[in-house]
Each structure stands twice: as C-alpha cells, then as structure tokens.
Amino acid sequence: MAEKILVVGGGGREHAIIKALKKSPDCGEIWCAPGNGGISYDAKCKNIKATDVDTMVGFAVEEKFDYVVVAQDDPLALGMVDALAKVGIPAFGPDKAAARIEASKVFSKDLMKKYGIPTAKYETFDDPAKVMDYIRAEGKYPVVIKADGLALGKGVLICENEQQAADGVKEIMLDKKFGASGNHVVVEEFLTGPEVSVLSFTDGKVVKPMVSSMDHKRANDHDTGLNTGGMGTIAPNPYYTPEVAAECMEKIFLPTIRAMNAEGCPFKGCLYFGLMLTPDGPKVIEYNCRFGDPETQVVLPLLESDLLHIMQACTNGTLAEQEVKFSDGAAACVILASGGYPVAYEKGKPISGLVDGQLPGEENVTVYHSGTAITEDGQLVTNGGRVLGVTATGPRLTNALSHAYEAAEKISFEKLHKRSDIGLRALKALAEKQ
C-alpha cells in the first residue's frame, strides 16, 4: 500500500532523499517541511521550522503520515524521533540519546576512547584558560579546536599558531559564536591523510555502508578559504579501497554500533563516518547522526535498492534481510553558492537556465535545491548560501565530473560562486593507482 511520507528539513540533502524515495513503488504522497522552492516541484511543502518539534509532530498526526524521515541534525538532537514514537508514528533517524553521537563532540570522543575506536588524541575543556595552558604545554601546531555542540559544520577551527588558537578559544568559548554549543570544547591533534565520508544504514544491529564519497569543505579552489557546509562531492572515493573498507568495518563501524548499544542508546538510522586515512590507519574525525550534505547528492543517485524499504528496515530492526545495492558507476556534485558564502551573502537573485527546477534535455543530471524560493510571480530565486547542487552520474568519475561542470555552466544568477576543482584530487589518486 502506498505510504504517506513526511521528510523533515529543507535543503539539498532533503531534495535528494525525496527524489530517491519517489522511486519506491510504495511511496505515495510525499511532503517536506519546511522544504524550499525547488523541493516544491517534487513534494508538497509545509512551512514549519525543522526545530519546532511540537508543531511538526502535531502536523504529522493531523495529516496522518505513515512514516517520517527526520533528515536534519537539530530536530534529531531535540528528540523529534522520540516525540513521534510517543504518538505512534514510525520515523527514520536516531532518538535523542543516540543523536548525542553528533550533538556532543565530548560524548563521541569519550565513547571512542572508552571502546578503543581509533581517533585523534584529544582533551576536553570547559575553562578557556585551561585550553590555552594545554595547547602551550603540548606545543604542537596545527592544533584542532572543536565546539562541543552543533554548529552547522562550522564549529571546527584548525589553528596554525598560538595566536590563532587564542582567537579561536575566544570566539567559541567567550564570544559564544555558536551559543551554548561552545560551553565545552575538544582540543585534538591534527591528523593528515586523505579524507573519506562513509554514510551507513544501521538498525542498531548490523551496518550496511553506502558507497564512499569525498567532500570539498573549503570555499575556494585548492582547498583555500573558509570552511563551508561543503562545495561539492564525488563518489566513490578512490582512496577507500576494499582493504580499507574491511578494516573500517572491523575497527570502526561495528565497534561504534556495539559501543552505542553498550551505553544503552542503540543507534538506528543513517550514521555518517567522517574518516581520515592516516599513516597509522583509518581514524574517525567525526560522526554525524544523519545523511551528509552534499554527500547525499552523490550517494543516493547511485543507490539501486528501494530507499523506503531500507529506511523502514532500519526502523524495524530487519536490515540484515534488506538488500542495499549501489551501481558501479560514479557521481559528482558541484555546488552553486551565493557570492560571499559562507559569510555575508545576498538573497533573492533570479535564477536562469532551469525549467521546473531542472535542466531541460539533460540526461543523467539532477539539480538538487539547497537554498531556493519561488516568488509570488513564479520566479525561482536564490534564498541561501548554498543555492543548488548539480549532480551528474556516469560510468567513471571523469565522465561524471565533466558532465556536472558542463551542466552547471547552463545555470546562472548574480554573483554565483563555484569551485572549479571538485574531484581533481580524486582523479589524481585514480591516475596514480593505474
């Protein structure tokens, strides 16, 4: 029977989830809250803040949704899945206790230390003076300072010297740039090596990893500029070999699920492993308790299995029996951002080149909407820092990348900013392998 589904969130990740869910024969009416302009071409949108748990749950009850996908980190940390369970609505995503794996860096680092999961050496602090005493005593730069709580992916500072570290501590702990998220900080050693993102499905018992991906966090080419939510992605990640995958499953993925069970907070949903392949082997840089953005925009287009069935198997504890299959191809996503992102940027710029939110006549290309709105007279306009993600799939990474960039050239808005080097590091790695 066709199911009525609500997706909570309003960015490119949610758009990718909706497009993948719609391929399921069991997916009926689909809604997104709050959604955005571009998502409204694919789903009915209801303007409720993702963090307004009570209103969202009330809406879910009123509209009699069969299943809710909580795609954003904030509502998960606020316990939206718990609140839905209380009114008898099944949901995809971890409960509040399990969502701490992302919502608190201190919780996740202490978890890894306790259960022997490889990660960077670290200390946690709630006193700014003690942070600087520790950093001076260690005397090693660069050093990484992380806000404990959620900070839209921007709460991590890499400090090259004592002055930068002092400025970073002031920004997070004294100026409260991220509010209460900066009451505690984690200070950790700087790791080197290729980064890999691995999203995984889990029902708290088994882990089924998705195809690996590589994010590009910095705003500008050659990995310069400020950290962003992500300026583009590719999948699969060439550094993530079958040997590395086997080691990660044995030393990181399964131990993490077992650790959460042992702590009395089993994790169900999408667990994202941010990894670094160091000279000492793979180590965890971060966990996210939900799909990554823009990793989702390259991972889900390669999924061949039924996403709705997989999600429900995670909720029901039946993932072991559920097929999770990805195509052998590749995908690349190029983010089109507003000029000035991730700091100050303007909104409301008309977007040209799209028809009903997509590029007409383009095969194997999908445009995912991160920050768009539709004006009263029907004009699609920019409405965020990251505006669109142009994803192309192909048999190989070279095809996917060239196609994504060709397609991106057909879209324009005032002060559009994109990186021109998405995937270049991955292509070099592939060339070295051959």
Model-derived regions: residue spans:
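Active-site "cap" helix and flanking loop/linker of ATP-utilizing ligase/carboxylase catalytic domains
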Residues: 249-271, 288-362, 375
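Active-site nucleotide/adenylate-binding loops and adjacent lid/helix of ATP-dependent enzymes
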Residues: 6-7, 102-184, 214, 238-254
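Solvent-exposed alpha-helices and their adjacent loops that cap or buttress functional pockets
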Residues: 23, 38-40, 62, 92, ...
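Internal nucleotide-binding/catalytic subdomain
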Residues: 156-296
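Short, charged, surface-exposed secondary-structure boundary motifs
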Residues: 40-43, 57-58, 100-106, 220-221
